[in-house]
């Protein structure tokens, strides 16, 4: 083909290079040089195109591709070169790059999407919990609870006196802690430490032997300041009843053994495989410097703990980290600028780990809304106590910490469930935005209650809502542990996703796994229907499919600070994509939530296959 084109150009040039009367020899020479340059340039272009085609290792064609790229939302085909996307377009355009060495993947009209991103997932902590005795948030009767825990303990081979931990306990168990005490403070449990970790990861129940290890007794409770008294539940006589909230949980978990490298690697492998099976090729881990044996809610400012971060390094060293991980470091409520410098030393330890970034910090502004914890900070009051919940740091302290982090170029991700915590978080971001326009995609996560006056502030301040919309359903949590204790307006206004979107906010999708399932298809279903086992929750706040697909692709990637390489299918981005088993744009909502990922690719390589 190249030779035919050159022959045509040569014949054309000979006609033009004939002497022209009146113009002399110089014009003939000019034509010769011009045609020579055209031939050279054309030959180089064809050679370059040929070389590029030779290196296109895979072409996907005959498909339907949702790109999450606003400039080219849909396509038929995609070419992959060296693990990156070389081109996206029609079958005709992309198949032009085919050579004898190119692998062709006929999509047979199936849908392809970017690899999904989860903007808030405790992936390693969740895996450690899954690999341990786990109640899976199930509400069970006391006989079943006792039977399961006794069975797990016998299977564990735990030595006497070694703390035994059961994960995934439904917080409804804490409603009457004396019932737990009657079972697990007698017989073997009188000397055997037991910790039931709440499925919300904010609450727990410890038996007497476990409280003894932590030094929590009557005297300890009596010496707590008024600000701290809410972290430990007490009986009518003022003795600890075993219920622990936020920093109270830390008092016990710091006495748990830290997982060794073998366990961290096993948990990491579990987490990566599970996420890849759901089509997830990236996530933001919001507490990478915390884990068993380390404090989370009451971290000391000088802490240099690395938490579960080594798990990601171990995976990467084995070539098994087939996901982008943006790992955040939890900052102490007492943190200042100096503490951010110390956190930087932790970041530097993992600076060269492939597929791992540490873009910033996570701040806990408050706790959770559910009874009996009720530690989420409200503008109003809880009906039963008349209290407003707790801010974990002062308004001024939050402003200073956010401002200092923004100045250092750190992404800031704030946990805020109550409307007072959300408002004060926005106030803090407003200070930083007024001082400088860093452009960093800061975010607030959870957002169970938001003052309607604050809806427009997210867009105005360029703050992303990172929402776990699997929670936007009517279930026992809302009916039994929330509804009786807050006013009707607040109850029906929970998780105001559509209101935030209508006011210009860009929503990112997240799971908060293991607090709820990591399955993004179920979460998107809940966001689109707001249906739950016990009815619907304010269906005016439903979101559409396109919004949710963007929330779990390019918007989540932006929230995690990885949108330069992931989150959409566009030229130059890493080739992270999935193939699904059904037409997600046409099936019913019930069918959508059962979507299965047939294949997941990371950097152009197949990392998961259903079959």
Labelled PLM ranges:
Residues 20, 24-36:
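Bacterial N-terminal signal peptides that target proteins for export
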Residues 347-352, 459:
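Acidic (Asp/Glu)-rich catalytic clusters
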């Amino acid at each position: 083909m190249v030779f035919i084109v050159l022959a045509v150009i040569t014949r054309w040039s000979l006609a033009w290079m004939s002497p022209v009367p009146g113009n002399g020899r110089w014009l003939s020479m000019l034509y010769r040089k011009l045609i020579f340059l055209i031939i050279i340039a054309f030959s180089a272009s064809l050679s370059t195109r040929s070389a590029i085609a030779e290196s296109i290792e895979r072409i996907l064609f005959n498909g339907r591709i949702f790109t999450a790229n606003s400039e080219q939302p849909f396509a038929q085909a995609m070419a992959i070169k060296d693990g990156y996307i070389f081109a996206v377009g029609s079958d005709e355009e992309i198949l032009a790059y085919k050579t004898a060495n190119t692998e062709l993947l006929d999509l047979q009209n199936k849908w392809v999407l970017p690899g999904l991103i989860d903007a808030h997932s405790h992936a390693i902590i969740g895996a450690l919990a899954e690999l341990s005795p786990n109640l899976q948030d199930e509400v069970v009767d006391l006989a079943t609870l006792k039977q399961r825990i006794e069975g797990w303990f016998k299977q564990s081979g735990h030595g006497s006196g070694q703390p035994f931990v059961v994960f995934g306990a439904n917080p409804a168990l804490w409603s009457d802690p004396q019932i737990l005490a009657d079972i697990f403070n007698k017989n073997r449990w009188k000397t055997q430490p037991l910790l039931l970790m709440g499925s919300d990861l904010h609450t727990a129940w410890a038996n007497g032997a476990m409280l003894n290890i932590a030094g929590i007794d009557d005297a300890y409770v009596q010496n707590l300041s008024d600000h701290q008294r809410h972290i430990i539940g007490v009986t009518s006589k003022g003795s600890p009843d075993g219920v622990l909230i936020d920093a109270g949980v830390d008092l016990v978990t710091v006495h748990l053994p830290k997982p060794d490298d073998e366990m961290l690697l096993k948990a990491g492998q579990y987490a990566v495989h599970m996420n890849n099976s759901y089509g997830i090729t990236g996530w933001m881990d919001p507490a990478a410097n915390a884990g068993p044996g380390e404090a989370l809610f009451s971290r000391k400012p000088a802490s240099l703990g690395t938490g579960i971060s080594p798990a990601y390094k171990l995976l990467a060293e084995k070539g098994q980290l087939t996901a982008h991980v943006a790992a955040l470091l939890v900052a102490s409520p007492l943190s200042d600028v100096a503490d951010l410098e110390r956190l930087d030393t932790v970041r530097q330890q993992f600076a060269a780990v492939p597929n791992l970034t540490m873009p910033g910090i996570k701040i806990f502004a408050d706790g959770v809304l559910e009874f009996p914890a009720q530690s989420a900070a409200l503008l109003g009051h809880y009906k039963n106590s008349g209290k407003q919940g707790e801010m974990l740091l002062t308004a001024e302290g939050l402003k200073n910490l956010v401002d200092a982090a923004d100045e250092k170029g750190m992404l800031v991700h704030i946990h805020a469930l109550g409307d007072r915590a959300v408002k004060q978080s926005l106030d803090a971001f407003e200070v930083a935005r007024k001082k400088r326009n860093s452009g960093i995609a800061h975010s607030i996560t959870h957002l169970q209650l938001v003052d309607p006056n604050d809806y427009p502030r997210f867009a105005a301040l360029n703050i992303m809502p990172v929402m776990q919309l699997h929670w936007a359903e009517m279930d026992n949590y809302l009916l039994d542990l929330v509804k009786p204790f807050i006013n009707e307006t607040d109850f029906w206004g929970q998780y105001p996703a559509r209101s935030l979107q209508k006011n210009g906010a860009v929503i990112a999708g997240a799971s908060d796994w293991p607090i709820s399932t990591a399955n993004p298809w179920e979460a998107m279903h809940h966001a689109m229907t707001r249906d739950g086992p016990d009815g619907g929750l304010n269906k005016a706040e439903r979101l559409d499919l396109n919004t949710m697909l963007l929330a779990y692709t390019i918007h989540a990637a932006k929230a995690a600070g990885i949108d330069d390489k992931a989150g959409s299918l566009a030229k130059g981005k890493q080739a992270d994509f999935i193939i699904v088993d059904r037409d997600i744009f046409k099936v019913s909502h019930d069918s959508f939530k059962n979507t299965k990922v047939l294949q997941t690719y990371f950097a152009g390589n197949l990392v998961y296959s259903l079959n």
